[in-house]
Amino acid sequence: MDQKIMERSNTIGIVGIITDKPYLILDASEWRKRLYETKLERVRPSGAKDIFILQFDGSAAGTEKRIEEITKGVEVMIGGEIRTENVYDPRPEENRVKIYIYAEMIAVNDPPVDDQNEVTIRGNICRPPYYRQTRSRTVKGKRRTVTNLIVAVNSNKGTNYIPCVCFGWQAFLANALEVGDYVEIYGRFQSREYRKRIDGQKPPYLVTVYEVCANKIKSRKIKEEGQEEERGSDV
C-alpha cells in the first residue's frame, strides 16, 4: 500500500473479488474524476463471506484503460479508507448510515497476490461502549464477551463514524473506554447479516452491518489502568 495512505488515521488494505460491473454514480468530463460503485467479496479463512460496498474514482485505477479492466469476476487489490455517510429516507432493509470502502488505489491482481484485510483507525470514542455476553460459548464453556464501539475518525474529507467490535480480552479493555477517549484500533473489515423486525411489518428484513473487528486496541486510558493490550489475542 502507498506509504502516504499508511501514515493516515484511517486506512484499509484489502484483496477481494468484484461481484458486479461498476456503475457510474458521478459523471465528469474528465475520466479521472468519474466516481464508480460496485460490490467487493472476499472469503475469510473460516469460509464465511464478506461483501462490501466499494467506491473508486478514475484516478484510483491510474489510467482510463485500467478502469475497463475492473469488472465482474476479477480479483483486485485496494488501498484506501473506510467512509461513512448518512442515508436519508432509508428503506426498511437499509441502515441509516452507509459504510463503504473508498479506494484511492485499485489494481487488478494478475498474477494473484497474497490475501489481505488490514485496517487501522485512529480517533475518539463518540458513544458509550456496549458490553455484553453472547449466547454462544467458548470451547471451555464460557460465554463470549463482546463490546461494540463507534469511533469518530477525522480526515480532510470530514469525519467518519466507524463501528468497531471487540471480542474476549479486547472486549474487556474496550469496555473501560469513555466518550472522548482517543484510541488506535488495528484489525480487519467485516460484514454480517441479521434479521430486523419492524412494527407493523410481518416479515423480518435482512440487514447487513459493516464493522471493524479489532485485533488490537491502543489507548492511554487502558495503559493507565494497567490493562496492557498485548494480553489480548487476535480474533
Task: Annotate each predicted stretch with a short phrase.
Residues 1-235:
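Single-stranded nucleic acid-binding surfaces, predominantly the OB-fold ssDNA-binding core
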